[in-house]
């Protein structure tokens, strides 16, 4: 069984707990075969797992030479790091107990009831299955793992994992093959092993799940880890949690800064997007305005030209109509039924009489052009002017026929100059144009 005092002398074993599974190199110096004179005893041989035989460097004692086999097999090792409040191993192989518990174990060879429950829980056994002292035959650890090939020849007690075990045999040879059977041991209560009031687990919140640390190798003595999942929350773990919380807080602050930067960038991009949209609208309006002006310009020009043509034609007609023409009294007084007598001073009828004013060849083309221009511009409503009866003051009372058209109409106004307009006997389409 490994002892911490032997580590300082270089003769201790690396295995911890009952049946430490260290190799023969940990047993101390010495050469030779199984009959070597060195005091270093092969601990694998004590566990009946040494496969080196005569090639083993350490001594393989006979059972008669080992006066007290339990002294080497039933010794438990206490964790000194736990006593110094610095044990950070999640699966510590040693017993976590106080210095007083260790001193009491060294004096009496028995563990306190509280520690017995923890050790039994780490081995998957009931506290009643643990040896009560160093004089008892130790438990076969290989059988607990299902690797014991010795059967009835095994020197250690074979206990079932479901706590149906054989009777405890005396001596060192018939532990596994003794006759008779004892009643099966009771199943241990999982809630009894935690010792909550004494350990103070009620004051702590359950810790987060973490990846399990370095486990023991499959061929190593992993059965000696007494407190696999019962490691208390100590100072080292508290410091690790505080450091992790500090790192997480820094990470949160960095993420908040990134979020604020992204929000500011988003606002700038939104402003630029709005500016680009306004510029696109201004460019569209400016490109549409010249086209509208070009479309309206010919229309205005056409209307202006049209109005100018109408005004010019009207001016020509007015100027021609205002030209004085001698009108004889016979033309005004002549009856409709009798032909007018030729005047005495009239010229011989060598040439045909001039046409009436409404049939003047100079005015006719202008009137036709005016009518064509008005008809092309828009469809006006027809306006007819009826002949008007006019009487001439200086002439004697003459009956003027209402049916006969007159050559001209003289209109007078007190405030405006006299203007003469020609009147035709036929209907004339006149359209009022907007000025």
Curated annotation (Swiss-Prot):
MF GO annotations: miRNA binding; zinc ion binding
Predominant place of localization: nucleus
Cellular component aspect of the GO annotation: nucleus
Biased composition (Polar residues): 315-331
Keywords, ordered alphabetically: Coiled coil, Metal-binding, Methylation, Nucleus, Repeat, RNA-binding, Zinc, Zinc-finger
Biased composition (Pro residues): 340-359
Region (Disordered): 1-36, 166-190, 315-363
List of residues that carry Omega-N-methylarginine: 186-187
Subcellular location: Nucleus
Zinc finger (C3H1-type): 36-63, 73-99, 134-161
Keyword Zinc-finger among record annotations: yes
PANTHER family: MUSCLEBLIND-LIKE PROTEIN, ZINC FINGER CCCH DOMAIN-CONTAINING PROTEIN 10
Protein name: Zinc finger CCCH domain-containing protein 10
Source lineage: Eukaryota, Metazoa, Chordata, Craniata, Vertebrata
């Amino acid at each position: 069984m490994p002892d911490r005092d032997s580590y300082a002398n270089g003769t201790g074993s690396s295995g911890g707990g009952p049946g430490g599974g260290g190799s023969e190199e940990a047993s101390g110096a010495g050469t030779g075969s199984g009959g070597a004179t060195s005091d270093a005893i092969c601990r694998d041989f004590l566990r009946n797992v040494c496969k080196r035989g005569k090639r083993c460097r350490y001594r393989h004692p006979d059972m008669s030479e080992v006066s007290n086999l339990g002294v080497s097999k039933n010794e438990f090792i206490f964790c000194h790091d736990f006593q110094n409040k610095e044990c950070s191993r999640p699966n510590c192989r040693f017993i976590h107990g106080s210095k007083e518990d260790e001193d009491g174990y060294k004096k009496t060879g028995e563990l306190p009831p509280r520690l017995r429950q923890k050790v039994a829980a780490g081995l998957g056994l009931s506290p009643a299955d643990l040896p009560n002292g160093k004089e008892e035959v130790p438990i076969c650890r290989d059988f607990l793992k299902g690797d014991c090939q010795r059967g009835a020849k095994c020197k250690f007690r074979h206990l079932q994992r479901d706590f149906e075990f054989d009777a405890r045999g005396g001596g060192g040879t018939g532990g596994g093959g003794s006759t008779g059977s004892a009643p099966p041991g009771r199943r241990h209560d999982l809630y009894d092993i935690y010792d909550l009031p004494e350990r103070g687990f009620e004051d702590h919140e359950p810790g987060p799940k973490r990846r399990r640390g370095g486990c023991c190798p499959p061929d190593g003595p992993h059965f000696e880890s007494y407190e696999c999942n019962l490691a208390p929350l100590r100072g080292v773990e508290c410091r690790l949690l505080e450091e992790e919380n500090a790192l997480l807080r820094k990470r949160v602050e960095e993420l908040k800064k990134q979020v604020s930067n992204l929000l500011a960038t988003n606002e700038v991009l939104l402003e630029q997007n709005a500016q680009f949209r306004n510029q696109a609208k201004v460019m569209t309006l400016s490109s549409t305005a010249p086209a509208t002006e070009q479309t309206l310009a010919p229309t205005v020009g056409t209307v202006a030209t049209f109005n100018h043509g109408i005004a010019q034609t009207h001016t020509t007609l007015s100027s021609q109509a205002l030209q004085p023409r001698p009108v004889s009294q016979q033309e005004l007084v002549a009856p409709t039924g009798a032909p007018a007598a030729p005047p005495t001073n009239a010229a011989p009828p060598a040439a045909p009489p001039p046409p009436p004013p409404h049939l003047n060849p100079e005015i006719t083309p202008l009137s036709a052009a005016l009518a064509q221009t008005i008809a092309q511009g828009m469809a006006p409503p027809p306006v007819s002017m009826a002949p008007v009866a006019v009487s001439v003051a200086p002439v004697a009372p003459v009956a003027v026929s209402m049916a006969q058209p007159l050559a001209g109409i003289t209109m007078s106004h007190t405030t405006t100059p006299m203007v003469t307009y020609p009147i035709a006997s036929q209907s004339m389409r006149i359209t009022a144009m907007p000025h």
